[in-house]
Amino acid sequence: MPPLPAEGSASFSNVHLAIVLFAGPYVFQKILPFRTGWTVYWIFFSLMGIPLAVGYWALISRIGKRINEKVALPGKPLDHYVDLKNSTLKQYEGRKVPMQKFHDAYFDAKVDFKGDVLDVMEYRHDWASFEFTPELFKYVFTNLIPEVVIHSKTQDEEQVRDHYDRGNDFYAWFLGPRMVYTSGVVKDITKMETLEELQDNKMTMVCEKLDLQKGDKMLDIGCGWGTLVTHAAKNYGADVTGVTLARNQAAFGTERLRENGIPESQGRILCMDFRDVPHDKGYFNKISCLEMAEHVGIRRYGTFLKEVYDLLADDGVMVFQVAGLRTCWQFEDLVWGLFMNKYVFPGADASLPLGWVIKQLESANFEIKSVDVLGVHYGATIHRWYLNWKSNEDKVVAKYGIRWYRIWLYFLAYSVIVARQGSSSVFQITCHKNLNGFHRILQQPSHQAIHAPISRKIESISCNGGFWEQKA
């Protein structure tokens, strides 16, 4: 089925919410049979604030109108799209099912899609609603908010290792031989470039934006399986250090470096927090940080950037790639975001609009050199991941079970759409220290955009041949 780019219901008005929060205690105070003062008002405000906010949010998410009706919905019944089997969701026959209730039932194999998951999800506005359910409110208040407030270093380590140390094969079954878990870049829209081409395009673009040269000291924060570290060392002759908290990734990346003939004196993967890298401040003149900062958390974001600033040389350059959300969100965006936080990226609460990210970078004394918005490129990348995952269904189910297969199938299918329609995006930001002595003129030749020419011949890396022979 072709895409159905229908608009959903928009976000609520903060002004209206504020009126409800402040007027509610006042009205309640006025109907009391005795006189009260400001002290009683503020007591009522503290007691009624959360219930009023929850009630307002739940109501507006349920009755809010679509932004526009330019794309007509087919108006087909729920059972045209999904098989409800004998689940409790049969109560929603003849009306739309809340998306949170549907995806939880799908993960538990209580419902099924009638057809390809991505195809049916394209028509989700015809059969699903994006209202805030009691389960979502419970998750926000008991999990999300406490994690945002606390977000400790120990929490980062536990969540990252729980996620990324699940098993290299789990990720290989959708990431493919490059083992890169960040957005690739489409260079030729007249053909369907392979996943490997998209990732090679991205890694080369990052190195070109860094103006990477032989002998440069490069740090890749959150290096994953070491693919960019290997690419930069092999093709640009840089001295590259990658850091990751995941033990499996560090071992895999180290093997990849050696397979490509990169000695430890030129390329290495360290399994540690980037703050523990054994080098003095200003040691690295090139830093890359690709889709790792989301895990830092909102509370620590500014501190994180200042720590990265200290690692960068005064004449150095950083490419900072981060996933983000749109400012004028729709309720669908929040429901999807909470699903991602609960099931896919726990603790990754720092996916925020571009303006917020830029402000944080500038507050840490970085100067922005360029910004590329890669949302549609992310959609293209995830679509290839989705196809890979589907093709490996039997292997995934045999080792990890049907539930993990379904969670990731839903995640990948929905993320293709979310990235394509602008709910989520990826921002690739090139920046440097905002110092008077920084030589900005010398930076102009490397002021790269997506389609800038490449300065050298790029050689593909070898991809852990022994590992892939075992997976075949």
Where are these regions (language model features)?
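A short acidic, Gly/Pro-enriched loop at the edge of an enzyme's catalytic core
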Residues: 275-287
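A short glycine-rich, Lys/Arg-flanked "PGG" loop and its adjoining helix->strand segment in the class I
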Residues: 302-314
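Conserved SAM-binding loop of SAM-dependent methyltransferases across substrates and taxa
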Residues: 225-236
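Substrate-binding/catalytic lobe of Class I Rossmann-like enzymes that use SAM or dcSAM, i.e.
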Residues: 323-441, 445-447
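Feature captures hydrophobic
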Residues: 1-199, 205, 234-236
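Conserved class I S-adenosyl-L-methionine
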Residues: 214-224
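Conserved SAM-binding strand-loop segment of SAM-dependent methyltransferases
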Residues: 261-276
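Conserved beta-strand signature within the Rossmann-like core of class I S-adenosyl-L-methionine
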Residues: 315-323
